[in-house]
Amino acid sequence: MENQISITSQYKAARLAGLLYLVAMATGLFAEFYVHFPSTLIVSGDAAKTASNIMANERLYRIGIANNIITFAIDVALIWALYVLLRPVNRNLALLAVFFRLVETTIACIAIINSYVAMQFVSDADHLKAFDSNQIQALSILHDTYALTFIVVAIFLGLGSTVFNYLLFKSGYIPKVLAAWGIFSSLLLLISQFTIIIFPEVEKTIIPACYGPIAIDEIALGFWLLFKGVIIPKMEP
């Protein structure tokens, strides 16, 4: 009876994880592509223009921050659902994946706070008038740390996603080809971020190549878990 309850919880967790994957992907893409990229607000290397853009589009910028907070709140729920689903496969590895992903969300929230602080100063005309050009540049650098911090975020996302996808592959809950693609795309993301740290000049070249595969993986996995669910082998009595 207890085993049956556990399996039922896994089925429900799988459906929930699928839904959360898709919702988090939608909110994440909105924030990154509509607010941050292509940069209608943020102009790299031009602090004054960035400050002017944020002041002129403060509501949009605030929506982007709120959207990011929602995205990472969803991520926490997703991490929990994946843990419930994969705990019976290997509890220790599932916990390791949870810790990796929680570090990811924690760092991301710190980045969001920095972005919010920069906006608070930049959007206040009285504050802005009190700053000289060097101080405005410093505020711009504070905002630029958002992008830099997300390199570290992506590293921990890659680590956690690799472990979760390994457990999905080992469990046989989903098609192995889908889990294998998840492992590949997660490792690709992980390696690419270290490459950017060591060779920053290649960042613009490899970003599409490293984020594209994992985006495809999370969308495909989300649809599969939500609409197909998982196949959990029955334990021998």
Where do the language-model regions lie?
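Hydrophobic, aromatic-enriched alpha-helical segments typical of multi-pass transmembrane helices
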Residues: 1-237
